[in-house]
Design a protein with these regions (language model features):
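Residue-level signature of outer-membrane beta-barrel architecture
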Residues: 120-122, 152-154, 170, 216-220, ...
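Repeated loop/turn-to-beta-strand initiation elements of outer-membrane beta-barrel proteins
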Residues: 125-130, 157-162, 223-226, 273-281, ...
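Outer-membrane beta-barrel "beta-signal"
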Residues: 301-315
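Hydrophobic, lipid-facing positions within transmembrane beta-strands of outer-membrane proteins
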Residues: 76-78, 112-116, 144-150, 208-214, ...
Length: 315
């Protein structure tokens, strides 16, 4: 997240120079003080840069993928659901994404991700799903995410079903990513705080995405309606990080942005607990390519998690 600072200002490559420069800017002979320096630039990243990989990883965790195959619904029918997803914790190597993969940030925030879903039946066998995560701070992050999906069954005969859904999301997540709390407690320039974080940052990740998913399922009547499903999807991720950190007396307001096409697959099953209550559990997989130094070629560091959805049919 801090790589733009280095790329746009070559004289900052050695952090010792940065310390020296900051001292000069803060205090001059005779007590004269200069205005605080603000660095604010925008850099477009290749999709396999470590910073871009991190943005894609976090965004993939919130894609509004389906749980099962779209089914025919009566127009005006409403189903409400609660989704709960496991978010894997990253290793220190995986979190080393800033400065083109040379500095570690804090990506291990929320171990789970939850949101409500409301699905409304529309004419011509279409259905609309809406979801919103309000800006309430939890696990050290404040999300503000609105997601939606339009789906329709393509084939329904006997136990077999095939369907398609289009989905998208807009919004952002705010948190101390660049300068987390466990780093700012150390003195700027110390081994534990090499890049001079002076206080917790308030970085903001914008997550705009769109996807198209094709799914198929088979209902097993002898297992009380258990329905295994499989789905594949193509996704477009338009991500952006706005850095908001203070390091060595300099305000970092740089912006990193990336556009990436990804593929994802899901496999799972739905099970009717009652005639109105449905439980769905699935595994989500999306390969994500990244080039980490000193490597010069990209490798797959995929996002994999388990997701669950409990749905109640109101009418």
């Amino acid at each position: 997240m801090k790589s733009l600072l280095i790329n746009s200002c070559p004289w900052l490559r050695d952090y010792r120079r940065l310390i020296y420069l900051a001292c000069l800017l803060i205090t001059l002979p005779g007590g004269q003080t200069l205005a605080q320096v603000v660095i604010q630039e925008t850099e477009s990243l290749h999709s396999d840069r470590p910073e871009a990989w991190a943005m894609n990883y976090v965004t993939s965790a919130t894609l509004l993928s389906g749980f099962g195959v779209p089914r025919s619904r009566a127009p005006g029918s409403i189903a409400v659901g609660a989704e709960l997803d496991w978010v894997p914790q990253l290793s220190s190597t995986q979190q080393r994404v800033a400065f083109s993969g040379t500095d570690q940030v804090d990506l291990n925030k929320a171990p789970i991700f939850g949101r409500p879903r409301v699905t409304i039946g529309l004419p011509w066998r279409f259905a609309l799903t809406l979801s919103y995560v309000p800006p309430i701070r939890i696990f050290g992050v404040k999300p503000n995410l609105f997601a939606f999906a339009l789906e329709r069954p393509l084939y329904e005969r006997n136990a077999w079903a095939i369907g398609m859904r289009m989905y998208g999301q807009i919004g952002n997540v705010e948190g101390a990513i660049t300068c987390p709390g466990d780093v700012v407690q150390f003195s700027p320039g110390s081994p534990e705080n090499l890049y001079g974080c002076e206080k917790k940052s308030a970085d903001k990740l914008s997550q705009h995405s769109a996807g198209l998913e094709l799914s198929g399922a088979y209902r097993i009547e002898r297992l009380r309606g258990l329905t295994p499903y499989i789905a594949v999807a193509g996704n477009f991720l338009d991500t952006q990080v706005g850095v908001n950190a203070q390091t060595f007396g300099i305000l970092d307001r740089n912006r990193l942005e990336a556009e990436t096409w990804t593929f994802s697959a899901s496999v799972g099953a739905t099970y009717p607990l009652t005639n109105k209550l449905m439980l769905s559990v699935g595994m989500f997989y999306s390969p994500l390519w990244v080039t980490r130094p000193p490597a010069t070629s990209s490798q797959n560091d995929a996002f994999i998690n388990v997701r669950a959805l409990l749905t109640y049919q109101l009418n």
